[in-house]
Structure formats: structure tokens, C-alpha cells
Amino acid sequence: MEFENKSGLITLIILIMASAVTLISQSIVTTSLPYYMDDFAISSATAQWTYSVFLLVLGVMIPPTAYITKRFKIKTILITSLILFIIGSLICFLSTNFEMLIVGRIMEAMGTGILMPIGQILIFRIMPEEKWGFFMGLMGFLVGIVPAMGPTIGGIIIDLFNWRVIFEFLAIITVVILVLSILLANFELETQNYPLDFPSLILSIIFCVGLMIGFSNIAEFGFSFIHVILPIIIGILTLIIFVKRQNKIENPLVNLIVLKNKYFVYGTVFAALLYFMMCGINVMVPLFVQNVAYYSPTESGLILFPAAIIMIVFNFISPIMADKIGVKPVLIVSSIMNIIGFACMMTYNMNSTFEYLLATQLIRGIGCGLGLSPAITWAMSVVADDVEDATAVNNTTRQVVGAIGSSVTVVIMQILANGNITHNQLSVNSFSMTSLMMIIITVVLLIITILFIKNKNDIVDD
């Protein structure tokens, strides 16, 4: 690929490498959940917080990225985020209780949340338009596909060593990338003295935390007003106040003008709902395979690995397909493949063979790979002039919805299984009903695509 801005390309490559490592940490803990339950004497609903809190903090960190990228140099942001991630990984490695593990996961997510959107912004600022699809496909691989490889890597490490080595592995690789960043990441975008609206930052934290805590607590507290209903209400009310404030003040934390573009909204909703399902699957499938079907952590990870590989392949080619035949037919095929995959998951039982579990996850992997990157690229391309704010809105929405997805999935499975996901028919039925929920969501995506998604030429002529 011929590209004049070599410094920008090198910086982007380092950002992609850093994002890949940090995003793997998002889901690499899912095969460790049974071990956290044993070592720290906690429930499955509590253990999944190691996954959900990561997504929650990502959602919290993304809104201020529009401000951060306008205010600070890219190299400063990159180095700071990597140092935060390394410290978090070391805390997890040394954790002596579950609370310490959660603190480490929060710091890992803080580093990832600062880092993740910068690459997307760089693509639209330094790349020619004809390269947007390719590089956004690569970033889509990081946002939605790399986390799918986490369970496989985590399962292998656990079987060979123990769950703590996962965090040692992450820290060592990140140190190498930190050295490369210090030596080679020299490209900078123009910065400005953009003020931080602190009240907006606080509001964004409150609404993310409120929604996440409310949904996550359902498994342990039912529909308790204090533990569930109240946090959700606070989250929703705070979100409303946040939106009103952004539309009123002169220097908003996130400029919500991008939401006036209906096509950006459609694409963001599609990507968020698809990500909801992907995050839910990253939790529900390992729980079923290990606790219900009695496979090992490595086997659990290997069942998801081919799906991750096929998602990588289709994630790269799907933006190219969308450029050639239009985004609408690509997203329709994506939804149909996901419906077939989830329908197959409804047939799982305690004696399902390794080959059948693997093959059906492969079908679903094709559907997810076809959908995520084209939806994100399409949404961002229609508001390219406001890419910093569009990135913040798109990523925040996707991460918060993804965090809710992982929590709601476990909650539904656990409630339907009477609080104990184990080797019995009730747990099989709970998995089937959760898969049915995924089918319903996918049908909604199909309807959105048919009714509202348009190819770019049609938008211009609209």
C-alpha cells in the first residue's frame, strides 16, 4: 500500500497492535470464571463482573475521548494508556481477593478505553477515503473480533499454567508495545486548548454505572428496588440530563449533533445490538460448555476459536463487499446467518458433541463477521466531518450495551436455571431460552436493515 504519511501509518500500526492486546483482555477472563468462583468463594453472577466491569469502564472512558484527542498529543495518550494497562494487569496477577482483582480489571479497562477510539479517529483524519473501509475493517476486527479470541487463549493458558499467568502474559506483551510506542510513535494531530466540562464527565460516569449495576444485580437481588430498579432509574434520568446539557453548553464533552443524522443513528443501533449479542455469547457459551456439557477450559476456548477466525476473515472482506454491492445486502445476509446460528444453539444438550458445538458457532461467526465492521464503517462515514464526536457516541453506545448484554445473558440463564448453571436439563433449557432471545434481537436487526439502511449513493440522493 503506497502511503505518503509514513509517520502517521507507523503510529496507526502501533495503535492497532496496542488495541489488539488490550482488547483481548476484555474476554480472556471468561474461561477463568469457574476458577474465580472456587478461589474466591463467589457466585457465577459475581464472577462475571470481571468481564462486565471491563465493558462498563470502557463505556465510561469513551465519552471523554473526543475531548482527550482534541486536548492532548497522541503519543502522550498512547503511553499513558499502556502504563495504566500494565499496572492493572500486575494488580490482577498479584490479587489476593476478588476486590483486588476487580481493581486491576478497572485499571486495565481505563487504559483500553482511552486507547481504543484513537485509531478510528486517525483513520478518518489521515487516510484517503478509499482506504476507510479497509482500515475500519481492521479496527472492527479489534472492537468485535479480537475479544472473541480471548476465551481460546485464556483456556489454553489456564490448562497449561493457571489463571494468574493470563495477566502476566498480557503485561509482558504490553511492555514490548510500550517500548515501541516510546521509540516510534511520533505522528501528532493538531491539539487545541479545549476545556473539559467536568459536570458532563460526572454525568456520563453516573449513567453508565447506574445502568450497568442495575442490570447486573438482577441475578442476585431479583427486582429489588434498592439494588436494581433505583440504579436503572438513576442511570436513565442522568442520561437524559447529560443529553440536555450537551445540547445546551458551548463546549460539550460530546457534541451530539451527529445524532441528528438518522443514518448514523441506524448504523449505531445495528452495531450496538450486534455487539450486545457478541458479548453475551462470550459469556454464555463457555458457561454452558464447561458447566453443563462438562468440557475443559481449553475445549471451551477451541469451540469458539474457529468462529473467531471466520469472523476475522469476514470482518476484513465485508467492508469490501459493502463497497461493491452495498451495505444493505451484506447486513441482511449477516442477520440471516445469525438467526440460523442461534437456532442451532437452541438444540444444544448435555451430550452435544464437540464437532456440533464447533460447527454451529462457526455459522454464527460468519453472521457476526459480516455485520459489525460494515455497520460501524457505514455509520461513521456519513458523519466523517465530526468523526471525534461520532466515535465517542458510537463506541460509548456499543460498550454500554455490550456490558448490559453480558450481564443480562448470565442473569437470564441463571434465573431460568433456578440460580445454578450446572449439568442438568433445567440449565439446558435456560440456554435454549437465552438463545431464543438472541434470535428475537437478530430479527429486529433484520427489520432495521430492510426498512432503514441505505447504500451511500441513495443517501446522497435522499
Features from the language model and the residues they span:
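Flexible interhelical linker loops that connect adjacent transmembrane helices
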Residues: 1-3, 130, 178-208, 247-262, ...
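12-transmembrane solute porter fold
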Residues: 8-24, 29-33, 42-54, 66, ...
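Membrane-embedded alpha-helical segments in integral membrane proteins
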Residues: 26, 30-34, 87-92, 144-159, ...
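Membrane-interface helix caps and helix-loop-helix hairpins in membrane proteins
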Residues: 98, 189-194, 218-224, 351
